[in-house]
């Protein structure tokens, strides 16, 4: 038994819906590792349950595993809006959302995240935002979502350690690595934000908007 197996055995198990999503994702997708997975999913669920958000925004749906994890903490009349750029995933996402009653609280938007964000009004504020889309756009996503997050609201950003590449010189010319470094620096230097990076899988940054 390795440490990950130990952690999984001592954590809340996945729901049947999530197990089905894991199964179909591994069968149908070329890169199933893009899915959050059991322990990161439990962290998303636990975080959402702690704050009981009325409104959640997710950038990057993939196969909706993380979507349903986040939805576990929604207020009874809460809503989760999830954005996915790849229209080829739409049917699979809708099938997966239908596996759980929580899927009824989810609004799927297919299209470019930046275009959608730029059209939103700050009259509709989110309690929690999860960023897990194009790594090269993380800094732009942050600028776009900050006005849409309520004061005291939360932003979670996935993959911010990028499998450790973030500090490796061998990746100094890799565009995704450079973009994530810039994002991490941007967050660290922004005094409007409280922040911490957790060494969970590829790195998870927790951000609280102060004002």
Where are the regions that the model predicts?
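A short alpha-helical cap/connector motif
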Residues: 1-128, 135-156, 160-211
């Amino acid at each position: 038994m390795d440490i990950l197996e130990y952690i999984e055995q001592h954590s809340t198990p996945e729901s049947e819906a999530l197990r089905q999503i894991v199964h179909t994702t591994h069968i149908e997708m070329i890169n199933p590792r893009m899915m959050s997975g059991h322990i990161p999913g439990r962290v998303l669920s636990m975080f959402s349950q702690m704050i009981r958000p009325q409104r959640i925004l997710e950038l990057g749906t993939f196969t909706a595993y993380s979507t349903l994890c986040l939805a576990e903490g929604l207020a009874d009349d809460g809503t989760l809006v999830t954005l996915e750029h790849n229209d080829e995933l739409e049917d699979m996402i809708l099938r997966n959302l239908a596996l759980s009653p929580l899927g009824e609280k989810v609004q799927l938007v297919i299209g470019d995240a930046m275009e959608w964000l730029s059209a939103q009004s700050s009259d509709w504020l989110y309690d929690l935002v999860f960023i897990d889309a194009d790594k090269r756009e993380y800094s732009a996503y942050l600028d776009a979502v900050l006005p849409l997050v309520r004061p005291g609201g939360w932003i979670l950003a996935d993959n911010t350690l990028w499998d450790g590449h973030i500090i490796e010189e061998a990746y100094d010319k890799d565009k995704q690595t450079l973009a994530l470094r810039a994002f991490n620096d941007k967050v660290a230097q922004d005094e409007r934000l409280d922040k911490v990076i957790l060494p969970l899988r590829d790195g998870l940054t927790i951000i609280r908007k102060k004002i």
